[in-house]
Amino acid sequence: MSVDISTVKRVAHLARIAVNDDDAERMTGELNAILGFVEQLNEVNVDGIEPMTSVTPMDMRMRQDKVTDGGIAAAVVANAPVTEDNFFVVPKVVE
């Protein structure tokens, strides 16, 4: 895959980034170098290799899930101007 100036300008337009011609020319070379590196990475055989989430092994501490009401409903709505049965009351905005 190769990136040209028109592609750089189109991507810049979609990202709402102002790019002048000199910068677009420079970015073309940089993006082509990045894409070349990505193509090299795609050539590496990674069959049978587990994905790594951290460079050091870490066991996740697990706990049992418990369904609760949180026990702080009154505190959550304490500063609300209008509440009803521990729910926020807001003006109707859709008919």
Curated annotation (Swiss-Prot):
Record key words, sorted: ATP-binding, Ligase, Nucleotide-binding, Protein biosynthesis
InterPro entries with a match to the protein in the record: Asp/Glu-ADT_sf_sub_c, GatC
GO molecular function: asparaginyl-tRNA synthase (glutamine-hydrolyzing) activity; ATP binding; glutaminyl-tRNA synthase (glutamine-hydrolyzing) activity
SUPFAM superfamilies: Glu-tRNAGln amidotransferase C subunit
Record's catalysed reaction(s): L-glutamyl-tRNA(Gln) + L-glutamine + ATP + H2O = L-glutaminyl-tRNA(Gln) + L-glutamate + ADP + phosphate + H(+); L-aspartyl-tRNA(Asn) + L-glutamine + ATP + H2O = L-asparaginyl-tRNA(Asn) + L-glutamate + ADP + phosphate + 2 H(+)
E.C. no: 6.3.5.-
Highest taxon of the lineage: Bacteria
Gene Ontology biological process terms from the UniProt entry: glutaminyl-tRNAGln biosynthesis via transamidation; regulation of translational fidelity; translation
Function according to Swiss-Prot or TrEMBL: Allows the formation of correctly charged Asn-tRNA(Asn) or Gln-tRNA(Gln) through the transamidation of misacylated Asp-tRNA(Asn) or Glu-tRNA(Gln) in organisms which lack either or both of asparaginyl-tRNA or glutaminyl-tRNA synthetases. The reaction takes place in the presence of glutamine and ATP through an activated phospho-Asp-tRNA(Asn) or phospho-Glu-tRNA(Gln).
Family as reported in the entry's similarity comment: Belongs to the GatC family.
Subunit: Heterotrimer of A, B and C subunits.
Protein name: Aspartyl/glutamyl-tRNA(Asn/Gln) amidotransferase subunit C
Phylogenetic lineage: Bacteria, Pseudomonadati, Pseudomonadota, Alphaproteobacteria, Hyphomicrobiales
